[in-house]
C-alpha cells in the first residue's frame, strides 16, 4: 500500500511520482493496475463526469460518493479527495467538520484544498490528524476570477508563489500541487520544499506529474489544455457504439454466438 512515507522516500531518492485524477471504480482500478502512485478524486468530476459547466455545483456528498468508488477500485494507492467549493474557508468548526466527514467517509489518505489563504485550516486539520494536500498556481475553483491562464509569470507573482508554497509546507501540508506555472519556478519551489511537489502544466522538474484520466485517454473530452498529452484514444469507442446501433437495427445482433443454447419452450408446450 502506498503511504505518505513512501512518497517522501520517492522525493528523497529523486524517483518521479505519478498521479492521475480519476473519479470511479473502473478508472481507479486501471490506475492501480498500471502502478500509478497517487489518485486524485478531483472536483473536476463536476464537468468531466456529471456534465456541469464548472465545479460550483459539486457537493461534499458528490465527493464522498466518488471517493468511495475510487477507494474500492484502488485500495493500495495513495488517494486524495478534493474539498469542493463551499466546504472550506467558512468557520473553523464547519471547515473541520466537513474535512473530517470527507476523510472518514471515503477512507482517503488525504484531502486537498486550493489557495494560499487556508494555512490556518491546514494547521488545524493536521493537528486533528487529517493529512492535507495544498494546490497553488491555477486553482480551478477560482478560475472564474483568475481565468484559465499561466500563473506566477511576473517577478512579483513568482516571489509570492514561492512564499505561499513555503507557508503551505510550514502549515503542515503533506504534498503540494502546482498548476500552470513557469517550469523554472516550479523547479525552484520543488527544490526549496521538503514535501513532494506534483505538477500539472508546470514542466518536468517537479517531483511528480498529474493528469486527468479522461484528458490523457481522450475519453469524452472536447478540449485539451496545452499541457495534456494523450496516451490513448478512448474516443474510438464511439465507433463501437455506432456498430452496435447498426447491428441492433439490422437484427444481426445478437447472433448465435451471443445467445444461450438452452431451448425451453418445447417443455413449456408439453406441460400445457
From Swiss-Prot:
The active site is at 179 (proton acceptor). It holds the Pfam family Pantoate_transf. InterPro entries: Pantoate_hydroxy_MeTrfase, Pyrv/PenolPyrv_kinase-like_dom, Pyrv_kinase-like_dom_sf. It is found in: Cytoplasm. Its main location: cytoplasm. Its EC number is 2.1.2.11. It catalyses: 3-methyl-2-oxobutanoate + (6R)-5,10-methylene-5,6,7,8-tetrahydrofolate + H2O = 2-dehydropantoate + (6S)-5,6,7,8-tetrahydrofolate. 3-methyl-2-oxobutanoate binds at residues 43-44, 82, 112. Mg(2+) binds at residues 43, 82, 114. Keywords: Cytoplasm, Magnesium, Metal-binding, Pantothenate biosynthesis, Transferase. GO terms for molecular function: 3-methyl-2-oxobutanoate hydroxymethyltransferase activity; magnesium ion binding. Its cofactor is Mg(2+). Pathway: Cofactor biosynthesis; (R)-pantothenate biosynthesis; (R)-pantoate from 3-methyl-2-oxobutanoate: step 1/2. GO terms for biological process: pantothenate biosynthetic process. Binds 1 Mg(2+) ion per subunit. Belongs to the PanB family. Homodecamer; pentamer of dimers. HAMAP family: PanB (MF_00156). This is 3-methyl-2-oxobutanoate hydroxymethyltransferase. It comes from Staphylococcus epidermidis (strain ATCC 35984 / DSM 28319 / BCRC 17069 / CCUG 31568 / BM 3577 / RP62A).
Amino acid at each position: 500500500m502506498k503511504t505518505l512515507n513512501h512518497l517522501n522516500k520517492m522525493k528523497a531518492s529523486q524517483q518521479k511520482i505519478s498521479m492521475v485524477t480519476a473519479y470511479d471504480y473502473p478508472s481507479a482500478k486501471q490506475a492501480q493496475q498500471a502502478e500509478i502512485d497517487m489518485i486524485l478524486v478531483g472536483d473536476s468530476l463536476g464537468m468531466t463526469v456529471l456534465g456541469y459547466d464548472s465545479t460550483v455545483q459539486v457537493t461534499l456528498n458528490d465527493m464522498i460518493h466518488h471517493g468511495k468508488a475510487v477507494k474500492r477500485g484502488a485500495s493500495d494507492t495513495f488517494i486524495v479527495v478534493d474539498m469542493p467549493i463551499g466546504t472550506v474557508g467558512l468557520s473553523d468548526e464547519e471547515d473541520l467538520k466537513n474535512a473530517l466527514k470527507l476523510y472518514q467517509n471515503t477512507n482517503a489518505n488525504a484531502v486537498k484544498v486550493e489557495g494560499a489563504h487556508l494555512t490556518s485550516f491546514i494547521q488545524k486539520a493536521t493537528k486533528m490528524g487529517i493529512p492535507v494536500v495544498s494546490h497553488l498556481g491555477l486553482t480551478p475553483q477560482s478560475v472564474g476570477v483568475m481565468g484559465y491562464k499561466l500563473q506566477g509569470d511576473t517577478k512579483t507573482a513568482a516571489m509570492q508563489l514561492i512564499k505561499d508554497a513555503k507557508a503551505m509546507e510550514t502549515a503542515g501540508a503533506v504534498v503540494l500541487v502546482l498548476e500552470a506555472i513557469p517550469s523554472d519556478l516550479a523547479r525552484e519551489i520543488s527544490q526549496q520544499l521538503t514535501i513532494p511537489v506534483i505538477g500539472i502544466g508546470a514542466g518536468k522538474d517537479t517531483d511528480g506529474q498529474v493528469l486527468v484520466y479522461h484528458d490523457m485517454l481522450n475519453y469524452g473530452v472536447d478540449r485539451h489544455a496545452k499541457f495534456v498529452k494523450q496516451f490513448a484514444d478512448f474516443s474510438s469507442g464511439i465507433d463501437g457504439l455506432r456498430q452496435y446501433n447498426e447491428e441492433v437495427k439490422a437484427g444481426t445482433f445478437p447472433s448465435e454466438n451471443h445467445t444461450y443454447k438452452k431451448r425451453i419452450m418445447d417443455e413449456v408446450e408439453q406441460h400445457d
